[in-house]
Design a protein with these regions (language model features):
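Short, conserved active-site loop motifs that form the nucleotide-linked donor/cofactor pocket
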Residues: 51-52, 143
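Short, basic/glycine-rich phosphate-binding loops at helix/coil junctions
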Residues: 75-77, 259
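Cofactor-binding loops of NAD(P)H-dependent oxidoreductases
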Residues: 57
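Oxidoreductase cofactor-interface core, primarily capturing Rossmann-like NAD(P)-dependent enzymes
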Residues: 1-46, 60-63, 67-72, 80-91, ...
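Compositionally biased, low-complexity repeat tracts
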Residues: 8-11, 53, 163, 254, ...
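A hydrophobic C-terminal alpha-helical subdomain
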Residues: 24, 225-226, 237-287
Length: 287
């Protein structure tokens, strides 16, 4: 990868993962082409201010993808399950990979999900496993698959946990279940590594995490960062199922099996210090 010459197309550039990867690449003076549906939005303007080339595009619009891929050396591919839905996410991920291969992209980085390869039975894990299969089979000169676990950023999302305002961490996970988590900035660091060390990481499939905590301990850590008392409030899984069958299956899998990242050894291998939940929470934008 030639710094200042090779262009990396980053999809989801104004979202959590894409934004983190774009910022990391830009911090090392790499050329970033940021794909977004809202090129005039504040997040896109912020990336442009850091030096990114912001281009409009939709993952469901093959024409805009073909245009964005022209001359790209690398691609960072991310899709949003909760926004697009399981079937659309799979379609988008496969199409982007196929178009990137057709466009002559040299290195393709796909961000999947932790344990996607383990036959979890979770719909939004299984569809990513099928996208992974597509990436493997296309014959890219090189590719890397990243598999991040549960995002720490989920805790600051009102739609994910509205009960935080009531002093409760409400989720359908057992009190004694340890949950592996990762800060999106750590994903960005691994994304940067995947591009800068593309030869060494060719065909590597890497599960990544930064910390592991039970829900009562998570409530204690988040409450301390928020400056208030926060109580873990377990939610019956059948109540979760009424909201989302997919989400319920995932939570049941967390209790029964769970992610399996060796955090310390992974950190040592890649030279990326893991962000702890406490460190992340201390800097999080609590409202």
């Amino acid at each position: 990868m030639q710094k200042g010459t090779d262009v990396v197309l980053v999809t989801g550039a104004t979202g959590h993962q894409g934004g983190a990867v774009a910022r990391q690449l830009l911090s090392q003076r790499h050329r970033v082409r940021a794909l977004t549906r809202k090129p005039q939005g504040e997040a896109a303007k912020a990336l442009a201010g850091l030096g990114a080339e912001v281009v409009p595009g939709e993952l469901d619009d093959g024409g805009s993808l073909e245009k964005a891929l022209r001359g790209a050396w690398g691609v960072f591919s991310v899709q949003n399950t909760w926004e697009a839905g399981v079937e659309a996410e799979e379609r988008q991920g496969k199409r982007l990979a196929e178009l990137a291969r057709k466009a002559g992209v040299s290195h393709f980085v796909y961000t999947s999900v932790g344990s996607a390869h383990r036959r979890t039975g979770i719909p939004h894990f299984e569809n990513k496993a099928r996208i992974e299969e597509t990436v493997r089979g296309l014959g890219f000169p090189s590719y890397t698959i990243l598999r991040p676990v549960f995002f720490m950023e989920n805790w600051t999302s009102p739609s994910f946990n509205p009960s935080l305002a009531e002093g409760k961490l409400a989720i359908g996970i057992r009190a004694d279940t340890p949950l592996e988590m990762i800060a999106v900035e750590d994903i960005g660091a691994y994304g940067l590594k995947a591009f800068e060390q593309h030869a060494e990481l060719n065909r590597r499939e890497i599960d990544i995490a930064g910390d592991e905590q039970t829900m009562p301990e998570t409530a204690r850590i988040l409450g301390k960062a928020m400056g208030r008392s926060l109580e873990f409030a377990p939610v019956p899984i059948e109540e979760v199922r009424k909201f989302s069958a997919d989400f319920a299956v995932m939570l049941e899998w967390f209790d029964r099996v769970g992610y399996d990242v060796h955090i310390r050894s992974r950190s040592r291998e890649f030279g990326i210090p893991p962000t702890s939940l406490a460190d992340w929470a201390a800097k999080a934008p609590w409202r």
